[in-house]
Structures are given as structure tokens and as C-alpha cells.
Curated annotation (Swiss-Prot):
Functional summary from the UniProt entry: Facilitator of innate immune signaling that acts as a sensor of second messenger signals produced by cyclic GMP-AMP synthase-like receptors (cGLRs) and promotes the production of type I interferon. Innate immune response is triggered in response to nucleotides from viruses and bacteria delivered to the cytoplasm. Acts by binding cyclic dinucleotides: recognizes and binds 2'-3' linked cGAMP (2'-3'-cGAMP), a second messengers produced by cGLRs in response to nucleotides in the cytosol, such as double-stranded RNA (dsRNA).
Source species: Stylophora pistillata
UniProt family annotation: Belongs to the STING family.
Alphabetically ordered keywords of this record: Immunity, Innate immunity, Membrane, Transmembrane, Transmembrane helix
A cellular component annotation (GO) from this entry: autophagosome
Transmembrane segments: 30-50, 60-80, 114-134, 144-164
The protein, known as: Stimulator of interferon genes protein 2
Any one GO MF annotation of this record: cyclic-di-GMP binding
Subcellular locations according to the entry: Membrane
Residues binding 2',3'-cGAMP, per UniProt: Y195, R256, R262
Length: 375
């Protein structure tokens, strides 16, 4: 059976997610693989070049010694650079770390791949010792210590001062996505824990309790509108007059955040689609906007919460992707929702999108019923 939670649509309205545009996927390991390929090719070319200039044994010793020297100096240079960071953190020791020296050092000298870095540093040091033991006279000249200290003390500080250590926008974006540090990640988690996790498991019961809509709502899911513009109308009928407000489901009353029997209530919307024979077919949906998107819209329009148009477009894509990941992993919510990305600019298209998704969901429901019957 097809995954009911997938973003879907049919026909003309399914042009790049209903006009929303492409939804990006998480970044993979292509950059790491490319770096490894460059490393291998460069190493091989250097080895060939050294072998042509010098005797094979001497050339290999030179290449190994220089690589170990530069690697060790680079690691030590990074430690020296981070020591400079400590000088700033000491000014905030009481406010940020409650006066804890261990906290200052931990946040400054923590490495994600500390084990690998330690192995590389020790291996480089042992390699230097071995090569010096084997050919001390060849590698004991004054040029090598100067090169070591330049690469250890001068170059790291210079690169830090001129900004070469600054992460690129791509790296910053990748880091934020991996560690859930984007604005969109926080909004998606808040939307889930503060609302969807509470109402989606109860949605079927609320529909069943409604004498008016229990037989009219044939797809028992919450349809969540996700406009790329992030602007949410106070009434969906303003975005598409064919989507009419029909009524409400019985409320779910939940004790939440000090409020006893807090009320959560879904709106039901009706769409009337004319058929070729002149009759009209009615569809009923439990439908609403994703309310956190309005926060993104207002942030992009507020001077003290600067969020440019391109940044907002990026965040809304991340919001949809993160929300889908969260809901797909939740047994309580899986199969009880449909994400409906739309452009937000084109009016009078929401009804077409919803009817197309209704048809796809109905087919999935029939397939599921047939499978259960066969079993």
C-alpha cells in the first residue's frame, strides 16, 4: 500500500507540489566522498612527483615526514587557536557557565571526532620520530622546525583573523539541519508537541462523535495547508471561495499548561465540485493552515526579527520536511494527516488540490480494505 502520509496531488494541480515548488532533501555525503577522492589523487600525484625528483626510498621518506609534520602542526595549531577562544569565554564564565572552569574548557576544546583526531596526531608524532631516527641528518635542518612553527602558530591565527575559518553558508545550513538548530526545526517540534500530538490521536473519535459529519467525512485525516508565502488567511474561503466553512467537530478537552479542560476543536470545510452531468458532488475535509507558518511570515516582516524572503522560503521547506519526518516517526499520528503544500500566490486552486488528494486517499483506503479482507 502506498504511504498515506506522502505529499500527493494529481493532474494539473500537481505541478511541483501544487505550485509550491520542489522540496529539498537532506544533504548527503557527496562532499565527503569528493574530498576523499581529491585526497587520494593528490597523494598519488605527489608520490609520483617525488619519485621522479629523488631516489624512491628518499622521496617516500621526504613525503611521509613532511605530511606528518604538517598534520601534527595543523592539529596543534587548532588547539592554540581554541586557546585564544578561551580568553573570550573567561569574561563570561559566571554568566554562561556559573563560574565552572570545566564548562569553559569543555565547550571550547570539544571535538565531534576527538578519537579520530587523537589517532591522527599520535600517528603523525610517531611517524616523525621514526623518520628522524632513520634519517636524522636529512631531516634535522633548520627549515623543518621553522615550517612546523609557522604552520602551528602563525598560519592558524592569520586564517582566523582574516575570516578564513568562518563556515560557509552551506556548512552553516548543513550544521543547523543536522542539529535541529533552524527556526523551522523549532517551529515543527513545537507544532507537534503543542498541538498535533494532542489532537491527531483523538481525531477519529471526534469525527465518530459528530452526528452531522461522521458519514460526510470519508477521509478521516487532518489536511494541513502549507503555503510557500507563509501567509495564512483568517478564513480559508478568502484563499479559495469554493472551500466553504461548514462547521466544527466536537471539542477535545485536555488539561494543558495549567489550564483545565483546554478546548481543541477542528473546523470542517465543504467543497462542491460540479460534474459533467450537471450534478454537484460534495467533499468534506477537516482542514486548517499550519499556524506556525504565520510566525515565519511575521518574522520576515519585522525589523527586529530579520528574515529575508529567500531565507523564509528556505525555512518553510525545512519546516515541511521536518514536520513530515516527525509525524512519520510517530505511531500516534501516522496515517492521520495530509500535508498540502501550495504556492500561496495562486487563488482558487486549493479546492482542486484537495479533491485530487481526496481521490488518492480514497484509493489507498480501498486498497487497505481489500488487503484486510484477503487476510
Amino acid at each position: 500500500m502506498a504511504d498515506n502520509a506522502h505529499l500527493r496531488g494529481t493532474g494539473v494541480v500537481q505541478q511541483e507540489n501544487n505550485g509550491f515548488g520542489p522540496l529539498s532533501k537532506r544533504r548527503g555525503n557527496t562532499a565527503t566522498v569528493t574530498s576523499a577522492i581529491v585526497f587520494v589523487i593528490s597523494g598519488a600525484l605527489l608520490l609520483l612527483a617525488v619519485r621522479k625528483e629523488k631516489a624512491t626510498s628518499e622521496g617516500i621518506h621526504f613525503l611521509v615526514f613532511t605530511a606528518a609534520l604538517l598534520t601534527l602542526s595543523f592539529v596543534l595549531g587548532e588547539l592554540v587557536r581554541r586557546f585564544c577562544l578561551v580568553s573570550e569565554e573567561l569574561k563570561h564564565r559566571h554568566a554562561r557557565y556559573q563560574g565552572n572552569w570545566k564548562g569553559v574548557l569543555k565547550t571550547t576544546f570539544t571535538f565531534d571526532n576527538a578519537g579520530s583526531i587523537l589517532v591522527v596526531a599520535i600517528s603523525s608524532a610517531l611517524t616523525l620520530c621514526f623518520v628522524l631516527y632513520e634519517q636524522y641528518e636529512a631531516f634535522s635542518g633548520p627549515g623543518y622546525p621553522i615550517l612546523f612553527f609557522l604552520n602551528c602558530l602563525v598560519v592558524p591565527q592569520l586564517s582566523f583573523l582574516v575570516g578564513l575559518r568562518q563556515l560557509s553558508p552551506v556548512e552553516t545550513s548543513d550544521l543547523n539541519e543536522k542539529e535541529n538548530k533552524n527556526v523551522a526545526d523549532g517551529l515543527a517540534w513545537s507544532y507537534y508537541f503543542g498541538y498535533l500530538k494532542l489532537v491527531l490521536p483523538r481525531l477519529g473519535d471526534r469525527i465518530a462523535e459528530s452526528d452531522t459529519y461522521r458519514h460526510k467525512i470519508t477521509v478521516e485525516k487532518l489536511f494541513i495547508l502549507l503555503p510557500k508565502t507563509c501567509y495564512t488567511f483568517d478564513a480559508i474561503t478568502k484563499a479559495d471561495p469554493r472551500v466553504k466553512w461548514a462547521g466544527k467537530l466536537p471539542a477535545s478537552k485536555i488539561n494543558r499548561a495549567g489550564i483545565l479542560e483546554r478546548s481543541y476543536q477542528h473546523a470542517v470545510h465543504r467543497i462542491e465540485m460540479p460534474l459533467p452531468d450537471g450534478t454537484v458532488e460534495e467533499y468534506h475535509f477537516v482542514l486548517e493552515y499550519a499556524t506556525p507558518l504565520m510566525s515565519l511570515y511575521e518574522m520576515s516582516d519585522h525589523a527586529k526579527a530579520p528574515l529575508t524572503g529567500p531565507e523564509r522560503d528556505h525555512q518553510v521547506v525545512l519546516f515541511i520536511r521536518k514536520l513530515k519526518e516527525i509525524l512519520d516517526d510517530s505511531e500516534e499520528c501516522r496515517g492521520k494527516y495530509e500535508l498540502v503544500p501550495i504556492s500561496g500566490n495562486d487563488t482558487n486552486k486549493i479546492a482542486d488540490v484537495l479533491v485530487g488528494m481526496h481521490g488518492a486517499a480514497s484509493i489507498d483506503l480501498e486498497d487497505e480494505t481489500d488487503e484486510q479482507t484477503k487476510q
